[in-house]
C-alpha cells in the first residue's frame, strides 16, 4: 500500500475572472519508505500542495489518501488530531512562540495531545540539536 496517494487534486482561489488555479488535476503516489521532493518556481503551487497534503487547507476537488484513508473525509476535530499526530510542517520562516522557552516550544504539541512528555527522548533531542540549557 502507498503511504500517500493524491488523485485529481485541484485548488482554485477566487471565482470567475478572478479565479486562480493553483493546482489543476494533480495525481501521484508515494510508496512507503520513499522520499519525495516538490520543486518549482515561485507561484507554481508547491506551498498550496503541501498545505493540502498536511491537512491545513482543503482542496477544491480531488482526494488525498494517507495510509489508504481519505484525509478530508475526517471531521474538523479528527483533522486537527491528524495534523498534530501525523504531519510535520516546517516553514521557511518558522515562528516559535516567543513567550515559551525551547523545551516548552518542543513539548507543546505533545502536551496539547494529552500525552506525557518522554523526558529521555526530550533530552536526546536537545542534545542532538545542541539546545540543552536554552
Where do the PLM segments sit?
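ABC ATPase NBD coupling module
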Residues: 17-20, 71-88
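Conserved ABC ATPase "signature" region
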Residues: 69-70, 117-134
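Short coil-to-helix segment of the ABC ATPase nucleotide-binding domain corresponding to the Q-loop/switch region
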Residues: 100-109
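Helix-to-loop junction immediately C-terminal to a conserved catalytic motif
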Residues: 54
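A short, flexible loop at the N-terminus of ABC-type nucleotide-binding domains that lies
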Residues: 1-3, 12-25, 76
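Conserved ABC transporter NBD signature motif
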Residues: 62-70
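The feature captures the beta-strand-to-loop junction immediately N-terminal to the Walker
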Residues: 39-41
Amino acid at each position: 500500500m502507498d503511504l500517500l496517494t493524491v488523485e485529481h487534486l485541484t485548488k482554485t482561489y477566487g471565482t470567475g475572472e478572478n479565479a486562480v488555479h493553483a493546482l489543476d488535476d494533480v495525481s501521484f503516489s508515494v510508496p512507503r519508505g520513499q522520499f519525495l521532493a516538490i520543486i518549482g518556481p515561485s507561484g507554481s503551487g508547491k506551498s498550496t500542495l503541501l498545505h493540502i497534503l498536511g491537512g491545513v487547507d482543503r482542496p477544491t476537488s480531488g482526494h488525498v489518501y494517507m495510509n489508504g484513508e481519505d484525509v478530508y473525509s475526517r471531521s474538523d476535530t479528527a483533522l486537527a488530531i491528524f495534523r498534530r499526530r501525523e504531519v510535520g510542517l516546517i516553514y521557511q520562516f518558522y515562528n516559535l512562540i516567543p513567550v515559551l522557552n525551547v523545551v516548552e516550544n518542543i513539548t507543546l504539541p505533545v502536551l496539547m495531545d494529552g500525552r506525557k512528555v518522554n523526558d529521555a527522548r526530550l533530552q536526546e533531542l536537545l542534545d542532538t540539536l545542541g539546545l540543552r540549557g536554552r
